[in-house]
């Protein structure tokens, strides 16, 4: 069985992962069939690059993504795009839907970032207030 999974590269404490198609019996960093993308978790925001045609090919021939690889593929919108193609939508409809999808993802990302910054500011204010009263 072929799996789409992550293969660790990079140096100590600075991981970079290759997204590969590999035999399920092969070790994590061992033999693989093809590199189909890269993932840099330490970049802000996380950097994901995929060869969409090759990912679609491997999924089409029955490769099973691991949970992490599945979430990375989903984050790029490839699964949504493949699902629309499977349903028989035209290229124009797919392009329009993908633009809307990308806009929604950007809004969500900005909203999460705003919440995070508000929490940090509130925490700093609480710490400053606690130090003043002490």
UniProtKB/Swiss-Prot annotation:
InterPro entries named in the record: Ribosomal_bS16, Ribosomal_bS16_dom_sf
Biased composition (Basic residues): 114-123
Gene3D superfamilies for the chain: 3.30.1320.10
Pfam families: Ribosomal_S16
GO annotation terms (biological process): translation
Keywords: Ribonucleoprotein, Ribosomal protein
Any one GO CC term of the record: cytoplasm
Any one GO molecular function term: structural constituent of ribosome
Region (Disordered): 105-134
PANTHER family assigned to the protein according to its UniProt record, in alphabetical order: 30S RIBOSOMAL PROTEIN S16 (PTHR12919), SMALL RIBOSOMAL SUBUNIT PROTEIN BS16M (PTHR12919:SF20)
NCBIfam families from the UniProt entry: S16 (TIGR00002)
Protein family membership: Belongs to the bacterial ribosomal protein bS16 family.
Protein name: Small ribosomal subunit protein bS16
Source organism (scientific name): Chlorobium phaeobacteroides (strain BS1)
Designated gene of the protein: rpsP
């Amino acid at each position: 069985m072929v799996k789409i999974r992550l293969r660790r590269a990079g140096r100590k404490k600075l991981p970079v992962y290759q997204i590969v198609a590999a035999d399920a019996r092969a070790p994590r960093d061992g033999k693989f069939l093809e590199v189909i993308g890269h993932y840099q978790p330490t970049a802000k925001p996380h950097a994901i690059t995929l060869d969409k045609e090759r990912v679609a090919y491997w999924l089409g021939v029955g490769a099973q993504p691991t949970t992490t690889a599945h979430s990375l593929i989903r984050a790029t919108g490839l699964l949504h795009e493949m699902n629309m193609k499977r349903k028989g939508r035209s290229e124009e409809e797919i392009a329009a839907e993908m633009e809307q999808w990308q806009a929604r993802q950007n809004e969500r990302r900005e909203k999460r970032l705003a919440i995070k910054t508000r929490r940090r500011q509130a925490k700093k204010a609480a710490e400053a207030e606690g130090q003043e009263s002490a």
